[in-house]
Amino acid sequence: MSTSGSGGGNTPDLSKENVASSPNANPKKNADTESSGGSKNNRQRRRSNTKGDGSNSRNGSRTNSVSNSKNQSNRKDWTDRKSFSQGGINVKSKSPGDDHKRTRSSNSQSAKRNARDSTRTMSQASNGEGLDYSDEYELDEPFSDSDDEDSRPKKPEKMSLTVARGRIRTLSGTVPVVGYSPRWGGPTMCVSCLEFFDLPEQISGFADHLLKEHKIVVSEMNLIVDPKRYIEHWRQRFAKESIDKIFPRIEPSEGDSYFGETDYYYLMSENVAEDRSLRQRLAMRRLEEALQCQQREREDTSFQLQCIFCRYNARGNRSKIIHHLYMIHHLNLGSPDNLVFVTEYIEHLKEKLHRNECIYCEKIFPDRNTLMDHMRKRNHREVNPKNHYYDKFYIINYLELGKRWLDVLAEDFEDTMPTFQDSDEEEEDNEWCEWQEDNLDADETRVVCLLCDASEDNAQSLLEHMKTTHEFDLLKNVSDDKLNSYQRLRLINYIRKQNYHADCWVCQKTEFENPLALQKHILEHKPLSHLPDASIWDTEENLVPIFGNDHFLWMLESILEENEITCSSDDEGESEERFSKLVLESKSNTVEGVIAEDLPELSELNEDDLNALM
């Protein structure tokens, strides 16, 4: 039983909640207390929560604070005992703020929920191209039962030793960014003086300088892979040994391109073994460097580039953007295995498109829409093969020194030329026939008669069939009635529709049960020398064919066009013959040698002379 003082003393709260939470509570005693003092406890709650005088309010708040502190200590004690009874050892004491923390499972669930929200947001922002997950949480496997498990802590990243960069052994002297080409060449000192030239940009001026100042000619200088390294090598050699002991001295004669410009010159060519070896070594080193750059691009997984035509972002590998340009926009850049420096290549094309310049014919247009229409209609869906700038983006141009891919293809074609040189036209005809046989079924283009179920391979034989079997000369009727192309379409569609509904298109009778009865009836109208009234069939609804495979419509138009061409040519020949006849007739009726001054005056002529002149 509980008692409460009438004064302002502390009143212990023995309500049902606190009794149940007490660790020493007896279930039976709790039940008796609940039954006997329920009404009194209810009054105590109402008294403590009801606004009254100041003393009652203070007493109620003081009572609640005391009960709360006791509840907290009781709960803590009960939790410790429970952990120890379940086998817990060395249970750590919790701080007062830990009572309000969530349980372990709720934390893991909230973490997973945040991870899912983060993943959903990033995946939507990635435009559908791969999922970008947040680095804050580790995603669990789908349908896993790891909700009660703690999230796995990330492993700390180990520090790395700073490794000194070794000497760069590349032809260009630098390691370019992935997707970009190195620069082969640069400022170069002359082989025999202190003047500098920027090679290979100033290679023509450098060649003139060598000829005029030093009487040196370098053969095929434009084919040297790296003129800078080439000149540096020979400048060091000439410092040890004079040029006349290495290269031959030549005096130009008539017919020589240098005749009259100089008395003699030293020719640096591949005829010297050292020169040939140097050129081949430079070419091989450039090929190795290009292949290394290509391998770096293949292994690069951080590739990201936007399409030059749309908003597609290619991520992960360069082949994605190449395949996208070919499959979606039909821009053929070639196979990814033959391409190198792809990022630089595509950025160069993007700059051209920003200037509204066609990538094939390199014409500039006023706006982008005009450029796109031009590239689509002209089928300019590749780069200009005659532009040497694009040679560095294709590995095939690095294989043979001094030969572009067009030259390599031409040599391959010449090697196989004798095998089919005499039968090109026959082979093309055979290939065309084979293509037609493989891709076109002969039954799909057969034309059906307008009066029966017979079919022919072409419209000309079908017209002969209708003319001989049914005595229906369609071409004659069309020419007699002077039907235009639309009227011819309406007529054929009208006949097809009437035959389909088993109605006579000649007399418009509708009493036939099937097409066979209609065919027998049409035989009674032989010969079909005239067409029905145009008001019956010359309507707009007959412009739409009733059958989708009625090839007689377009085949008939082709025959009529050919006849018009032949008729026009015949008319021109007849007009020329008629004109020549008129010219001859006018010449025969012309009196030659008569001058107006020789004619007598009319007043001097009598009636007999006038009659003779008339």
Swiss-Prot record:
PROSITE patterns according to UniProt: ZINC_FINGER_C2H2_1, ZINC_FINGER_C2H2_2
UniProt feature, compositional bias: Basic and acidic residues: 74-83
Principal location: cytoplasm
GO CC entries: cytoplasm
SMART domains registered for this protein in UniProt: ZnF_C2H2
Residue stretches of biased makeup (Polar residues): 18-41
Cellular localization per UniProt: Cytoplasm
Biased composition (Low complexity): 54-69
Composition bias, Acidic residues: 132-150
UniProt-annotated stretches for the region Disordered: 1-160
Gene ablation phenotype (knockout): RNAi-mediated knockdown suppresses lethality and sterility caused by let-7 mutant background.
Record has Hydrolase as a keyword: no
Gly residues: bias regions: 1-10
Keyword Transcription among UniProt keywords: yes
InterPro entries with a match to the protein in the record: ZN622/Rei1/Reh1_Znf-C2H2 (IPR041661), ZNF277 (IPR040048), Znf_C2H2_sf (IPR036236), Znf_C2H2_type (IPR013087)
Start-end of C2H2-type zinc fingers: 356-380, 447-470
UniProt entry keywords in alphabetical sequence: Cytoplasm, Metal-binding, Repeat, Transcription, Transcription regulation, Zinc, Zinc-finger
Induction text: By microRNA let-7; probably by direct interaction.
GO molecular function: zinc ion binding
Family: Belongs to the ZNF277 family.
Subunit structure: Interacts with rps-2.
Main function: Probable transcription factor. Limits the ability to tolerate cold environment or cold-warm stress. In complex with rps-2, mediates the cold-warm shock response by promoting translocation of components of the RNA exosome from the nucleolus to nucleoplasm.
Protein name: Zinc finger protein ztf-7
Gene label: ztf-7
